[in-house]
Amino acid sequence: METDFSLVRKEEEEEEDNRNGMSYLSMEMMKKVSSMAAPMVAVSVSQFLLQVISMVMAGHLDELSLSAVAIATSLTNVTGFSLIVGFAGALDTLCGQAFGAEQFGKIGAYTYSSMLCLLVFCFSISIVWFFMDKLLEIFHQDPLISQLACRYSIWLIPALFGFTLLQPMTRYFQSQGITLPLFVSSLGALCFHIPFCWLLVYKLKFGIVGAALSIGFSYWLNVFLLWIFMRYSALHREMKNLGLQELISSMKQFIALAIPSAMMICLEWWSFEILLLMSGLLPNSKLETSVISICLTTSAVHFVLVNAIGASASTHVSNELGAGNHRAARAAVNSAIFLGGVGALITTITLYSYRKSWGYVFSNEREVVRYATQITPILCLSIFVNSFLAVLSGVARGSGWQRIGGYASLGSYYLVGIPLGWFLCFVMKLRGKGLWIGILIASTIQLIVFALVTFFTNWEQEATKARDRVFEMTPQVKGNQKTQIIVEEDTQVLLNHIAETV
């Protein structure tokens, strides 16, 4: 009789969850995920375009400037920006689950402690950038290009520090599901960046130095705008009582999760840069590198778009796990996967339909366009796989699976993908196609790993782990009372303050 009663209770709970829109695939959850993903697309694109616009304006100076800025952008992404993004990925877990558990003081502790850690790390990155020309000489780059690239990298250091503060602040709002401040600040920074970059590069004759400085000013403007929103947010009251002990304990939790998070993100990011370097070793390196660059750019633009769904999935999964709602967390996962699949179909069908003409967006050379057309089917498969991979990576960050993701990235890309790509490219004579097939297989392996982990996960157990993580060392933390906070009032408080000022 006891077993029967338990079964009845379980069925009643599932029926109630279904009525509340918490079935394994619910329209309500899809609306939540998509409503957050839409503005995050604008945020991601706005931040992505800052470096692209500076590169385009520098490219119109002369061919030498374009080469130097392109190489510097690639190396600074590998040695700096990618690491910051990777470390900040730990906050997707920590801040999101803390908000779900209503431990609001911990959100501020995690945010501030991560800022301190990342700022200290930035100084070591800056030293590397000061000697960028020496690093480029190791790869036998042209001395003049190396000097210009080093000069651009040095003047990009202020942008690195601004970007370092921007990432935790973005996670601070994202973990609460507040997207309006992110949308306004990133769009405002982009609108400022375009004329300001033009002014520095062309009118004031700063050249590539102006292109680098404009990125720094734009990042710091974004940080300033987000700080204003944060200063007048409801959660700011919970952050005023933070002490040294709380910051140290939060710092330990952050570092423990930040290292595997950086491993998970950076190893995948770096593999594409290695792909580009390998294409330069081919006989017709100019053609091969051009086509691989076109594919990488197309894939990067698509990833910026689909990663917004992953960010939304990360937020909803972490919030629900922190709140102990394991069924809602699973519903968020399934809804995000469904939306990612829809986006994958639309993108791949569109790209394949225009496979004979999309290359003209990047080049007027018929040989380049013809080669791009040949590699498009492989690129479409890669984009299809990466659409689901971006979503499941977001689920992994929200669930705290960064360590699994790090090992998956290491094994799939560096033990399988890159060696296989080299074999297909140079031994089987498939050239650039072979390189891209290797990366495609690596992405597929990583996707399978994430899919298996997600499918066989006990979400009720994950919810328990999340709450254990959040409430770790909670007795020492002041200001973690379960205060009822309505996140929608954050923006309203700021607007009221502005209205009173005016």
Curated annotation (Swiss-Prot):
Tell me the superkingdom of the source: Eukaryota
Q: Which InterPro entries match?
A: MATE_euk, MATE_fam
- A GO molecular-function annotation: xenobiotic transmembrane transporter activity
Specify where it is mainly localized: membrane
Task: Give the CDD domains listed for this entry.
Answer: MATE_eukaryotic (cd13132)
Question: Which Pfam families has this protein been placed in?
Answer: MatE (PF01554)
What Gene Ontology terms for biological process does this UniProt record contain?
Answer: xenobiotic detoxification by transmembrane export across the plasma membrane
What topology in the membrane does the UniProt record assign? Multi-pass membrane protein
Tell me which GO cellular component terms the UniProt record holds: membrane
Compartments where located: Membrane
Keywords for the protein's UniProt record, in alphabetical order: Membrane, Transmembrane, Transmembrane helix, Transport
Q: Which residues cross the membrane?
A: 36-56, 68-88, 112-132, 143-163, 182-202, 208-228, 262-282, 291-311, 331-351, 375-395, 408-428, 436-456
Q: Which family does it belong to?
A: Belongs to the multi antimicrobial extrusion (MATE) (TC 2.A.66.1) family.
From the Swiss-Prot or TrEMBL record, give the protein name. Protein DETOXIFICATION 7
- List the source organism: Arabidopsis thaliana (Mouse-ear cress)
What lineage is this protein's organism placed in? Eukaryota, Viridiplantae, Streptophyta, Embryophyta, Tracheophyta
- Record gene name: DTX7
